[in-house]
Amino acid sequence: MSSAAEPPPPPPPESAPSKPAASIASGGSNSSNKGGPEGVAAQAVASAASAGPADAEMEEIFDDASPGKQKEIQEPDPTYEEKMQTDRANRFEYLLKQTELFAHFIQPAAQKTPTSPLKMKPGRPRIKKDEKQNLLSVGDYRHRRTEQEEDEELLTESSKATNVCTRFEDSPSYVKWGKLRDYQVRGLNWLISLYENGINGILADEMGLGKTLQTISLLGYMKHYRNIPGPHMVLVPKSTLHNWMSEFKRWVPTLRSVCLIGDKEQRAAFVRDVLLPGEWDVCVTSYEMLIKEKSVFKKFNWRYLVIDEAHRIKNEKSKLSEIVREFKTTNRLLLTGTPLQNNLHELWSLLNFLLPDVFNSADDFDSWFDTNNCLGDQKLVERLHMVLRPFLLRRIKADVEKSLPPKKEVKIYVGLSKMQREWYTRILMKDIDILNSAGKMDKMRLLNILMQLRKCCNHPYLFDGAEPGPPYTTDMHLVTNSGKMVVLDKLLPKLKEQGSRVLIFSQMTRVLDILEDYCMWRNYEYCRLDGQTPHDERQDSINAYNEPNSTKFVFMLSTRAGGLGINLATADVVILYDSDWNPQVDLQAMDRAHRIGQTKTVRVFRFITDNTVEERIVERAEMKLRLDSIVIQQGRLVDQNLNKIGKDEMLQMIRHGATHVFASKESEITDEDIDGILERGAKKTAEMNEKLSKMGESSLRNFTMDTESSVYNFEGEDYREKQKIAFTEWIEPPKRERKANYAVDAYFREALRVSEPKAPKAPRPPKQPNVQDFQFFPPRLFELLEKEILFYRKTIGYKVPRNPELPNAAQAQKEEQLKIDEAESLNDEELEEKEKLLTQGFTNWNKRDFNQFIKANEKWGRDDIENIAREVEGKTPEEVIEYSAVFWERCNELQDIEKIMAQIERGEARIQRRISIKKALDTKIGRYKAPFHQLRISYGTNKGKNYTEEEDRFLICMLHKLGFDKENVYDELRQCIRNSPQFRFDWFLKSRTAMELQRRCNTLITLIERENMELEEKEKAEKKKRGPKPSTQKRKMDGAPDGRGRKKKLKL
């Protein structure tokens, strides 16, 4: 630290310690103060007295907190008012010294004239007498001074010169757990300079550079060097509450921090027992808690209001933005890793919160930086830089954190599975009029189509009815029916073998449900975090994943809930299962691992489904990401209308790849190994990055970005022009196919013919009986029919053609021709035998009856002849029994016997699965006398976060009671949950659909089967350990009981 800051300087006049009767904002310490906020109860009582009837409940709390104190209206805090006036004067003077540009904003704000420069009349503005004096004190030295004025100015300058700004050269002594890095010390000095000049600011360092630590260091400086311990408020996302609290205790333990979180009763107790007594310096709370307890927080004069992830207030009309603007604050600080996500108006919203007296008009700001009229103006860019320079500090990892390895992103392009293509086609066909620009293009309709297509790209099981069942099983079909899951199933074993640990992000929590089933099936230990995860469980999962030598391999997170403020630097691989519309959200997700403390190169794998809407979404996000860096790093301006996705652009996204999907119904998934997939993805990623860099160079030179052209121009085609002639284009839907029955051998015989001309069919007698193989005529009949056909060919002089496809074509032709030449006609006995044999088959069984018989065998199993007979319509049980006996005896005579047997065996496997599940449930339930109260489930390390054990117990016991194999059992189970008083207020369980209950029960059954198997193996091991039992004869000789239960007397 510099010499000027070695002894802690005395507090300046504006932050002098206040008397005990002063407001909380004083933050000073004296003989009656213990270092925390003082006068909290007195001020709260006074505020409650003036609040009115609406605050009656809060008045009671205040009365409890300060018994015996008389309610009286407290006078405005003179220290607070003095600090605000001094800061305002210092702020204007500081800004005008930075650049005269701020006179444009400051003078209109002081004069209260029309805010838009277009409405201001030319000429010298009129200034009121009292306002003129204020402006003169700000920096107008051109008028003639009196001697008294000059003396006052010299005294003021002298007093300012004695207050040297504190500047640290090394990590402050009050920072205990470690030392600040060089760039963090510079950031702390910048924050201190803002405070000294009465300026609020934005700390916009890239995610992972320690904005939390720099903020805590600033609050520590306020306490140790300015004697202002608080009260300070830190407003953070719910997911980062615990992290902020632990960071306070770790880095600056002398700061007393408290956390407001909980239900209504817990919050009331916190306000009464913790907040009002004032034994604290910093209050950390979430956005939601702030909104609920705004009436309490408004009663404080906050010294510092810090908002983490400040883009939450980018919309000045949101409820959170309006509430925080109502608070009394001396200083404000915004923290964000993404200072500009969309447009300049959002930047104005942040600046207006920081300095409302400077940036008081959005119209003025928008006119001053008119992106429509001034694009390409170099002076305008310089003007923007000058405006941002005093308020905003942004560093990126590549510039300041040399020890942090750069992250490497690879886009992995995957194909659609057969099921995905069917669902994708179905979604497009439902709105084919939109694709061909014939229907009404409603924006909500287009957004819904986009959402459905994105669900299809992730996994078809996200649609109700897509997953095969019941019963629902967790096995290979979970992987093979999604292209992304196929790649994931190849990638994870490779990463585990390399010793990596993985974060998987997805937009959809139901995708996390599928991934959870997959991890349980593959025995990957995992953690999960989404928007429904309770606060305590969130932190438990983070701690379990980050602890040394943790066995957790996968951490699955929803992008919105798990992408903010969480430190998961113990992972080195990030998998983006799907991409967000806003690329900043994906960047935040990546930086959960790519942050200070990371020692490995972070690899990011972004899954993109090829030739689908996902390609367009990622391309648009890449464009938006480049535009985001323009204002902050490169100085270019973003058109405000650019980031609004229009109907035409959405339509182009939907149309992209539609023709390709319609062209085939087969799967695009290949057996390519993971190394080949990664190599191909890296190559394609490099090509896309090169294309984007070339696309932006001309715009960078001219400080423009023709983003409309950039979005619509792709692969050399202007999609705006294509939209104009959309009516001439037509995406042809797939042809409807007529279903037909084919003989398998004839099909393959025709399909295998390549280019040779078809040989003429061998002639048959004109009156040939229609004989089907499933009618099981006697084999002798087929011999007689063959003899009759050969003789007919002989009579017409038929010559067998040579078949070039056969290996011994000449020999085969000779043998077949010899049969014809030696053929004889049927004699009278053979004709009579033929007629008799034609009556011995199952002539009354047609193809429909045969198909019903096969399906019944598949449904009930070959041994359940009673139920099979009921399934075959128009046949008596005796007829079915007779046919079944012949079928299983002579089934090998059928042409497609392999296909039929596979169908029946699949059905029998399902039956056996149902039996094994029923047996497992019977075994589990049988261990308890009162299973609805006593049953315990062995979750192991993979307990889900959504369902409680009480809910799981009820599901299993009620499923067993209703009957697992009963039809519509899950609909009945859902009704039982709704009727049960036990779950009267369990809205989560009561809102589950039948399919969601099936999936949960399937997971529980898997756990029960695993538990039963482990118990059986344990019992076998114990029996083996005890050794074989003694033989019966030996026991009887030793006096063992006989068959009647008595011991035989031994004769001596």
Curated annotation (Swiss-Prot):
Residues 1023-1034 have a biased composition (Basic residues). There is a cross-link at residues 83, 644, 647, 694, 722, 735, 966 (Glycyl lysine isopeptide (Lys-Gly) (interchain with G-Cter in SUMO2)). Residues 16-55 have a biased composition (Low complexity). SUPFAM superfamilies: HAND domain of the nucleosome remodeling ATPase ISWI, Homeodomain-like, P-loop containing nucleoside triphosphate hydrolases. The keyword Phosphoprotein applies. Residues 192-357 form the Helicase ATP-binding domain. GO terms for biological process: antiviral innate immune response; cellular response to leukemia inhibitory factor; chromatin organization; chromatin remodeling; DNA damage response; DNA methylation-dependent constitutive heterochromatin formation; DNA repair; DNA-templated transcription initiation. The modification N6-acetyllysine is found at residue 440. GO terms for molecular function: ATP binding; ATP hydrolysis activity; ATP-dependent chromatin remodeler activity; chromatin binding; DNA binding; helicase activity; histone octamer slider activity; nucleosome array spacer activity. The modification Phosphothreonine is found at residue 113. Its EC number is 3.6.4.-. Component of the ACF-5 ISWI chromatin-remodeling complex (also called the ACF/WCRF complex) at least composed of SMARCA5/SNF2H and BAZ1A/ACF1, which regulates the spacing of histone octamers on the DNA template to facilitate access to DNA. Within the complex interacts with BAZ1A/ACF1; the interaction is direct and is required to slide nucleosomes from end to center positions on a DNA template in an ATP-dependent manner. (Microbial infection) Interacts with JC virus small t antigen. This is SWI/SNF-related matrix-associated actin-dependent regulator of chromatin subfamily A member 5. It comes from Homo sapiens.
